[in-house]
């Protein structure tokens, strides 16, 4: 005799970058097991694949995970996690005042939003009608390149992966980065002067991020400090 099937609740959310409404469900025991095994391995590729698989399954395979900006995937996963194991996450955060003591806090995951920096734009004017149109890093671009976060050592690789278009004459002439070699893109980026390069960096600094400010109290010094959590890893510290 077949065993009865349990009813799984469904919820709705808006994808931050598009405002598109999608339905999702909590992850099940079999999916939680996949995530736990990936977390135990501490391999970035395993964790990324687990997050992708869970988001895909829990959104009923209705979204194209590989093409989504990283912050969209992180936000969706956070919502799935909050409905699966609880809206409150217990965190241990390093206190900024002495940089050695940890404070335990309860964070309501439903309060965490994707935030965009001031004056953010994906169109970067360089000179004389020439410029770059940028696109956001995807979870796949990070995974394939082995990049965990954006820093000085990998900035050129990240930039070249996120160029959507290079244009001249105010857009009358355009170049598709897919038609260029990696070296050609790197050479182009290295031609930028300091001011132009800072404008490109600003795109990444101000782009949408899973972000939340929280005040923590050092249990030893009793000093209160503001801590900014960014990216999925910070919310499960």
Please tell me what each predicted stretch does.
Residues 1-237:
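Long C-terminal interaction/binding lobes of large macromolecular proteins
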